[in-house]
Amino acid sequence: MYSFNTLRLYLWETIVFFSLAASKEAEAARSASKPMSPSDFLDKLMGRTSGYDARIRPNFKGPPVNVSCNIFINSFGSIAETTMDYRVNIFLRQQWNDPRLAYNEYPDDSLDLDPSMLDSIWKPDLFFANEKGAHFHEITTDNKLLRISRNGNVLYSIRITLTLACPMDLKNFPMDVQTCIMQLESFGYTMNDLIFEWQEQGAVQVADGLTLPQFILKEEKDLRYCTKHYNTGKFTCIEARFHLERQMGYYLIQMYIPSLLIVILSWISFWINMDAAPARVGLGITTVLTMTTQSSGSRASLPKVSYVKAIDIWMAVCLLFVFSALLEYAAVNFVSRQHKELLRFRRKRRHHKSPMLNLFQEDEAGEGRFNFSAYGMGPACLQAKDGISVKGANNSNTTNPPPAPSKSPEEMRKLFIQRAKKIDKISRIGFPMAFLIFNMFYWIIYKIVRREDVHNQ
């Protein structure tokens, strides 16, 4: 009886053992067929137990990491001449390969991770060399993207608003073409560890319908390499050049057309009567002051540069024409009043000449009496053989031809007034013709010659 119970217990234990083993094998089979959870996979891929160290670059002590970059421009604007910078909002995308992040355990070909995972992986130390100010975007969440592919490729995208320096050459302003650059450089890794390069296709993309208030962003993009050499080593650098052509519509309406009308307004004084001194002087001074204000306004939004700009030449010539119109009336007024000065000069000359003439005649008469009476010669002794007196002969030989009759004051006044009117008539044609010639040279030089030089550069 005892042996039978022992045998039955043994059989029962054997059955339980095999059933447990079978259940464990079934559970193991189920667990093998079930995919790993994302949390477990990430812990295994880059957690503390994975051995991944974000402080060490991929291929440590090996070949440099090649980082492919591209940018997508969301907005481009706020180009300031005074501070010589521009503002741009972009998506910056960087791609590189990290063999430590390659996987086969997870079924998906790529993983889109939360931005908080960025602190767990290695990232390039990219910075913008010509950056003056920048900020990230966090509304409604951090505008960052992290994607890891099965082969270890990493895509890191971030949205940034940048204020970048843009040195400008304003000699042709406002008909200029500016070139603004964006430089992407490594801060700490030399070219032995890290190399930046532009993406082969679509390195620089622009949002559809992107427009600028005063410029046209040209479609061709100039992509270059700008390797930097410092005391600490040779660092990788890439740059994109944006060519911006300024539109003249605003400046035509605000500067060129008003100044042109002011110059034309100053020519009205040539048709106003020269006797209307208050009208002509008031018009001349008003146009000069208005032109001065217009010229100052054109320089208010520009930096204080040492060279001459195209707008400076235009404003200076317009001011010169307006001021010359005012001086023209001064010349006309001076010429029209010259007859009064001439009459005053004649009166002074006649006043000084009359006493001298009387004195000369008295001396001449006194000398005659002395000569003839001293030698006892009377008037009869001065008769010649032909009956002509000596004195009469002398007078006939020394008399000058009679002077031309002088013009009357009224005739002189009319003569000088005609001369003044002639100056006005010449100015009516000369000023517009001179301004037209200046315009021809000005627009040909700045719209054709200078622009071709810029394109050739």
UniProtKB/Swiss-Prot annotation:
Cytoplasmic side of membrane: 273-277, 331-425
Stored Gene3D superfamilies: Neurotransmitter-gated ion-channel ligand-binding domain (2.70.170.10), Neurotransmitter-gated ion-channel transmembrane domain (1.20.58.390)
Membrane topology: Multi-pass membrane protein
Pfam families (UniProt xref): Neur_chan_LBD, Neur_chan_memb
Keyword annotations: Cell membrane, Cell projection, Chloride, Chloride channel, Disulfide bond, Glycoprotein, Ion channel, Ion transport, Ligand-gated ion channel, Membrane, Metal-binding, Postsynaptic cell membrane, Receptor, Signal, Synapse, Transmembrane, Transmembrane helix, Transport, Zinc
Swiss-Prot/TrEMBL catalytic activity: chloride(in) = chloride(out)
UniProt KW Metal-binding keyword: yes
Location within or outside the cell: Postsynaptic cell membrane; Synapse; Perikaryon; Cell projection, Dendrite
Main localization of the protein described in the UniProt heading: membrane
BP terms from Gene Ontology: acrosome reaction; adult walking behavior; cellular response to amino acid stimulus; cellular response to ethanol; cellular response to zinc ion; chloride transmembrane transport; chloride transport; inhibitory postsynaptic potential
Positions bearing carbohydrate: 66
Stretches that traverse the bilayer: 251-272, 278-298, 310-330, 426-446
Activity regulation text: Channel opening is triggered by extracellular glycine. Channel characteristics depend on the subunit composition; heteropentameric channels are activated by lower glycine levels and display faster desensitization.
Tissue: Detected on spinal cord neurons (at protein level). Detected in spinal cord.
Binding-site residues, glycine 1: 93, 157
Cystine crosslinks: 166-180, 226-237
Single Gene Ontology MF annotation: zinc ion binding
Keyword Hydrolase recorded: no
Residues in the Extracellular compartment per record: 29-250, 299-309, 447-457
Illness: Defects in GLRA1 are the cause of inherited congenital myoclonus of Poll Hereford calves. It is an autosomal recessive disease characterized by hyperesthesia and myoclonic jerks of the skeletal musculature that occur both spontaneously and in response to sensory stimuli.
Family: Belongs to the ligand-gated ion channel (TC 1.A.9) family. Glycine receptor (TC 1.A.9.3) subfamily. GLRA1 sub-subfamily.
Subunit structure, as described in the record: Interacts with GLRB to form heteropentameric channels; this is probably the predominant form in vivo. Heteropentamer composed of four GLRA1 subunits and one GLRB subunit. Heteropentamer composed of two GLRA1 and three GLRB. Heteropentamer composed of three GLRA1 and two GLRB. Homopentamer (in vitro). Both homopentamers and heteropentamers form functional ion channels, but their characteristics are subtly different.
Comment field (misc): The alpha subunit binds strychnine.
Stated name of the protein: Glycine receptor subunit alpha-1
Lineage: Eukaryota, Metazoa, Chordata, Craniata, Vertebrata
